[in-house]
Amino acid sequence: MKLTPEQQAMLNGEKGETMAKVVKTLVMYGDAFGAERMVPVTSKYGHTVISFGLKAIKPVYELYDQLIDAGLTSAQKFTADPRPIDDNIPTSLLEDIVFKKIMYTHQASYEEQLKKLGIKGEDDYSCTCYMDEVGNKPAKGEVLSWAESSAVVYANSVLGARCNRNSGIIELMGSVAGFVPEFGLLTDEGRKATWIIEVKCEKKPEAQLLGSAIGMKVMEEVPYIKGLDKWLGTELTDGVCAYLKDFGAATASNGSVGLYHIENLTPEAKEHGEALIKEGAQVYVIDDAELERVKASYPIIWKNKDAKPELCFVGCPHMSVQQLKDWTDAIEEKLRANGLSKVTVPTVFTAAPAVIKALKGTVYLDKLATYVLPSRRPSGLR
């Protein structure tokens, strides 16, 4: 690892022992992946994946206290993943005891730590920090220090930013130091595709199912996807971005994809085309039958396979304003067609606080509260 004089001075302790430990951690991280140098974090905001005050992660709180005591707030403001608890969602006494008295006993104190470290705002908790309403949308080519896998793959693929699939804590250290080791998806070579995906479906593939199929096949490698522009077009409209949000999250969670290219659609694919494909790339053909095979491969994990669902959650990653409107319209249509006034399974739609605020003053927020969930407060959202 070749450090700049300033970085070497930080490692030597000129900015304090705690900062030296931060830099040493980043150096060790880079060494593990063959990085030769550090590069500056250039995005306006960071993002942290750890947003939950679990009792079991005491070492995290101790580490963050060391940063705070040393005056090492983040060099950039940051957003965070969703809070684990929302009072809008009805819970039983037992659930309240488990969630608030046993599991998330450090939530309030942890959020105080995040404030001291530099969280962007009181309600900036969302896995879709890149949405316009949340305001953490990096530009093409910017270097990030993020860990949330669905946000990383979206930023890399749809926005053209550059970010590795970092771990929690490491991502905050990159924001504190202001630089990260250069390897993998931060490099031109690391962003080239080693898989060609040929989509040959007769109907628009379901985003989550297509993403799952690709993720399980390519794992952590980079796919170049052909044929999907037939269904999505060549422009990144709000609807297309919502599709890619869900698609990318599935590639990242069912595999470990941090970047994908879609021919004629995503920015780097538009700019470079098939020059992004490495020689000897493997080919995976996906048709309707293949998607059905993948869907059928998922096991039913309920102990009682005939049990009636008690609660449904929709929105991981968090939903967009347009998705919430579309779901509301679809539910309203189906309820009317079936002579019902409310869905038979209580349902929670999850979205960023800023997205929910954007729905206020429209008919959609009240409709969702009426149709989907008997909540404590007038909202079927969290």
Label the model's feature ranges.
Residues 1-382:
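Non-transmembrane, aqueous-exposed alpha-helical and coiled segments at domain scale
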